[in-house]
């Protein structure tokens, strides 16, 4: 579900504009996580480039498009934070092309829709990396699967739900699948099982029973997003603009105004508007949260609350 184009912001988590990757500590702004995340994104770019060359992925503009990444803040304290963040990140070769400005006129050129009607007496600042990207992970995933389907050893099973994962005596994994159309179940033996980081991962991790699953909990804070496909508005904004979340607020609360190119059509994604749901997936059960509570994750759940 998370790979669908509209179910993520499409930054690729490059670390250019996501301010929660550079937390402010007693020693100042910490940049190590942003550097690590960006290095991983560069590896993803290299992989995709290689797959394009071998014909396993289509032309890059079918799933990734150049889009500037901008971090924007207001207020003296936040401006000081962004100034320090820029000072530290721009010294690293991965971020050497980052631009910084506190000039209202410059920011108006970078993101006119964001600056329109804003109080010019309030201190503002922004950083921009022009070589950022908008990634349509839905298109990327569909094309990767289409390529994998040419391999006889690959089998994609849709309309199936994993209902249990057990360690077998031979140290392999017995994975029980339920066909949601017929109701029938089968068991597949696998040497390795990989769980993605989507909404359905926690219940599967808990079913595996591995020691590392203990202590994890899910608190499904939701964000409602709106989409603008008005051509005139879309033409006036070409960037991914990220704000700064309030102290203690989850990353989901970071305000966005994102250029999106989904299935080749430009649009604007903006939000979030706070919400709450006990579902872990869009089409999940309202009991997902309750069913995930264990004695070993009660402390973590209470800390979130």
Residue ranges and their predicted role:
Residues 15-17, 178-180, 273:
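Generic beta-structure capping elements
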């Amino acid at each position: 579900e998370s790979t669908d184009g509209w179910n993520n912001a499409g930054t690729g988590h490059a670390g250019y504009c996501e301010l929660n990757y550079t937390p402010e500590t007693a020693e100042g702004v910490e940049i190590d996580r942003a550097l690590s995340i960006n290095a991983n994104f560069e590896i993803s770019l290299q992989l995709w480039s290689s797959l394009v060359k071998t014909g396993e992925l289509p032309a890059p503009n079918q799933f990734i498009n150049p889009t500037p990444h901008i971090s924007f803040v207001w207020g003296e304290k936040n401006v000081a934070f962004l100034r320090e963040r820029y000072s530290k990140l721009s010294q690293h070769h991965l971020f050497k092309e980052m631009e910084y400005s506190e000039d209202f006129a410059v920011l108006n050129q970078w993101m006119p829709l964001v600056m329109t009607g804003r109080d010019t007496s309030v201190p503002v600042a922004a950083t921009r990396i022009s070589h950022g990207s908008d990634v349509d992970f839905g298109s990327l995933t569909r094309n990767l699967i289409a390529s994998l389907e040419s391999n006889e050893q690959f089998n994609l099973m849709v309309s199936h739900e994993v209902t249990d994962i057990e360690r077998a005596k031979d140290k392999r994994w017995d994975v029980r699948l339920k066909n949601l159309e017929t109701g029938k179940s089968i068991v597949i033996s696998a040497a390795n099982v990989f769980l993605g980081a989507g909404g359905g991962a926690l219940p599967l991790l808990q079913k595996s029973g591995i020691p590392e699953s203990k202590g994890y909990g899910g608190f499904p804070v939701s964000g409602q997003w709106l989409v603008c496909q008005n051509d005139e508005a879309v033409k006036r904004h070409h960037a991914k603009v990220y704000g700064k979340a309030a102290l203690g607020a989850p990353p989901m609360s970071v305000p966005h105004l994102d250029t999106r190119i989904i299935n080749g059509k430009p649009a604007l994604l903006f939000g979030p508007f706070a919400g709450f749901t006990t579902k872990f997936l869009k089409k999940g059960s309202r009991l997902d949260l309750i069913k995930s509570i264990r004695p070993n994750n009660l402390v973590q759940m209470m800390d979130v609350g």
